[in-house]
C-alpha cells in the first residue's frame, strides 16, 4: 500500500510541474493532409427525397420492409408512400414486387390499430385501380386469404372492418373474376358472421347470433351491413353466369357473287346428365352447393325478418326494419335467379320444386299472411329529414316500393300455379300494382324498372294460371299498362319504355294470352301506336324486331296502322337511326328492314297506296334507291 501511495504522489507532483507550461507552436493543430475514400452501398443507401409536405419518400425496398415493421407509424408511412407512388404514375416498377406488396398491404386487414387497417384498405383500392386484372390474378389468393381471416377474426372491430376490404374488391375486381376465384368461400364466411351452427334436434341447422355487448339495435344494423355485402357477392355470381348473346350472322344476297348458306341446322345438344334424363334425384356439384346456400340462408333470412317485423296492430316499419326487409327480399330474389340459371343450364326443375315445397308456405305466412293483410309495407316518417338518395338506397323510402315489388315477384315464383283459395291474396297484389301505375310519374327509373319486372311476372309468366282466379283485375292492370305506355308515362332512361314495349309485344305474340286478354279490342290502342315509334329520331333494335314478329303473325291491327302511316315513315327513313344495330352495318340495310315490313302489310293495301308512294319516290332522284327497293317489295310474288 505504501508503494502505491508514493507513486501517486509522484504523479501529482509531475502534474504540478507541467502547470503553466505551453506546447511548442504547431503541435496543437489538427492534421488535414490525409486522404479518404467515400464508402458507397448503392442498393441500400439511395438519396432520400421529400414530398411537398416535407414527408420523407422511401425507396421500394425500404418501403417493403417498413410494411412489416412493428411500429404503426412506420407501417402507415409505408402505405402512404405506396399510394403516392401509384398516384404519380409509377406503377410499372412495382410489377416485379407484387407478391411482397400484396402480402404487406393485405396483412393490414388484421392490424390491431384501426387507423392502420383503414390505410391498408385505401392503399389496396389505389393499387387495384392502377393494375390490370391479369396482373392481379396470380396474387388474388393472397388478398382472399387475408379477407377470410379478417371476416372470421375474434375481434369484432376487425370483423366489421373486413366489410370495407370487401367493398374495395367489389368495386375494383371484375364480377366474373371475383365469382370464379373465391365467392363460394366468402359466402360461407358471411353466414358465420351472423349465425352459428346449431347442435340440437331443430330442423334448421344454424341460428342467428346476438352481440350482447352492443345491444339489439346495433345487432340488427350489423346483420344488415353483412347481408348487403352478401347480396353484392351473390349479384356477382348472377352476373358472371348471364351469357351475352352474340349478333346473328347476316348474309346479303348479291346476284353476281356466289352465296354460301348453312344447309344443315346445328345439332341441339342435350346437356342433361343421366340422372335427369331418368328422372332420378341427383344434383351436380354446382347444384349441391346452391342447395346448401339456400338451405342455410333462407331460414336465417326469415328469422332475421321475424325479429324486426312489427306486430299486426302496427303495420308501419321503422328505418331498421325497412332496411332489413330491403336486403332480405333482395337476397331471396338473387337466390331464385341463381336457381333459375342453374335449372336452365341443366334442364331440370328439382331445386325450384324443393324450394317451393319447403319454403313457400313459410314465405307466405311471414311476409304476407294468408290473405295478404300484411301487404303492402310502409315506413314510419323520419323525424330528421335525410337526403332522398340515402333513404332510397338504404331502406327504399317511406313507401317501401322496392320491398313491396320484390314481394310481388317472389310470390309469383313461390306460387306459379295458384289455387282458388288464394284469389284474395293475388287480387290484393294486382290491386297494389294498379296503385303503383297511378303513381308512375313520381317513381325513379330504378323503381320503374322494378315495377316492369313485377308486371312481367303477373301479366306474362304467371298470366295463364292467374286468369283463372283474378281475370278481371289482371285485365284492368294490362289496360292501365297499355294506357301508360301509349301516353308515354314510362321513362326512356335505363331502357324502361323499351322493356314495357317488349313485354306487351311478347303478350301479343302468345296467341293464348292475346285471346284471353281480349284480343284486338284490348290491344288496339297499343298496336295502333306502334308505327309512331318509327317516326322518332331513333328506334331500338328490339323494337324493330318486335314489329317484324307482329307482321309475320299477320296482325291486322298493326299492319293497318303501319299502312296508314306509310308516307310519313318512308319520308323519315333518311333521318332514322337504329340503336344497338350491328356494328359497321350500312345505313341502307337498316332502311331496308323498315321497308320489309310492307311486304306483309301490302295485303291490306286495297287502294294502291303503296304503288302511288313508289311513283312519288321515283320522281325524286336522290331517293331512287329507296323507291327501287320498295317497288321490289310491293311487287314480289
What are these regions (language model features)?
Residues 1-83:
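N-terminal "cap/leader" segments of large eukaryotic alpha-helical scaffolds
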Residues 35-50, 79-92, 121-133, 167-176, ...:
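Boundary/linker elements of alpha-helical solenoid repeat scaffolds
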Residues 53-64, 89-109, 134-150, 175-198, ...:
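HEAT/HEAT-like alpha-solenoid repeats
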Residues 67, 81-89, 108-109, 120-131, ...:
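Hydrophobic residues within the alpha-helices of tandem HEAT/HEAT-like
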Residues 67-73, 108-112, 150-154, 194, ...:
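Alpha-solenoid helical repeat architecture
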Residues 179-322:
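Alpha-helical repeat/alpha-solenoid scaffolds of the HEAT/ARM/MIF4G superfamily
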Residues 309-637:
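Long alpha-helical repeat scaffolds
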